[in-house]
């Protein structure tokens, strides 16, 4: 079925639910996982250091959860102007056959409306996407 699942996260509560769901699915089907966090590249050394600390913590949580679930996992941090493009490119470059992501992230959008990143991934990717509400 699925062999390699990409799980984008931003560390939000909804994204964490998508991580949990993606890891459960990966364990069930025997797939490996790549956890990815994409941050927009913004200027300033201090802000960049804060981003590094935040992303390291988020990706460590993904890796630790995968280890506890017995799921092979690698993680990647990408700086990009368009997060959806980085998600799609990573899925393609790494041969992922499923993307599991939250309906929306830190933007605080209503659960009724898909987040802009999720919507753009759904619109432009050729890889199947499982959206977790």
How would you describe each model-predicted region?
Residues 124-133:
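Short, acidic/small-residue loops that bind anionic groups at enzyme active sites
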Residues 98-124:
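Glycine-rich, Arg-bearing micro-motifs that act as flexible, cationic patches
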Residues 3-52, 65-74:
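Small/aliphatic-rich secondary-structure junction motif
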Residues 52-60:
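Short, surface-exposed alpha-helical segments at coil->helix boundaries
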Residues 67-99:
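Structural beta-alpha unit
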Residues 37-38, 102-104, 133:
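Short secondary-structure boundary segments
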């Amino acid at each position: 079925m699925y062999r390699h699942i990409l799980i984008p996260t931003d560390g939000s509560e909804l994204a964490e639910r998508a991580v949990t769901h993606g890891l459960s699915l990966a364990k069930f089907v025997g797939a490996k996982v790549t956890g990815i966090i994409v941050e927009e590249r913004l200027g300033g050394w201090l802000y960049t250091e804060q981003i590094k600390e935040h992303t390291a913590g988020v990706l460590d949580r993904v890796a630790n959860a995968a280890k506890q679930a017995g799921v092979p996992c690698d993680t990647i941090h990408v700086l990009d102007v368009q997060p959806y493009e980085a998600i799609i490119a990573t899925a393609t470059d790494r041969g992922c056959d499923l993307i599991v992501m939250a309906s929306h992230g830190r933007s605080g959008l209503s659960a009724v409306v898909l987040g802009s990143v999720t919507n753009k991934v759904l619109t432009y990717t050729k890889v199947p996407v499982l959206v977790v509400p």
